[in-house]
Amino acid sequence: MSRTVFCTFLNREAEGLDFQSYPGDLGKRIYDHISKEAWGQWMAKQTMLINEKKLNMMNPDDRSLLAREMEKFLFEGHDVHIEGYTPPNQ
């Protein structure tokens, strides 16, 4: 049986993550308060960020940038801005 969380990103009850997929306190916070659906949306944005900004996950500065963007996206309601990208609906 899947677990349910109140997703702070979607602002409603939704299916929770199966396991803590990010380390540390931030990972615990994500596991407790972010749904699978919201995490999937972040994963898509993360992929775009890594590709468009040519981030190197071996570089601590790039990992820090990604962690900051993730926290802003999931918990503060900020969308990820990728220069030159126009969503398909617009």
From Swiss-Prot:
The keyword Calcium does not apply. The keyword Iron applies. GO terms for biological process: cellular response to oxidative stress. Keywords: Iron. Coiled coil: none annotated. Transmembrane segments: none annotated. InterPro entries: Fe_traffick_prot_YggX, Fe_traffick_prot_YggX_sf. One of its GO terms (cellular component) is cytosol. GO terms for molecular function: iron ion binding. It comes from the Bacteria. Monomer. Could be a mediator in iron transactions between iron acquisition and iron-requiring processes, such as synthesis and/or repair of Fe-S clusters in biosynthetic enzymes. Belongs to the Fe(2+)-trafficking protein family. This is Probable Fe(2+)-trafficking protein. It comes from Edwardsiella ictaluri (strain 93-146). The lineage of its organism: Bacteria, Pseudomonadati, Pseudomonadota, Gammaproteobacteria, Enterobacterales.
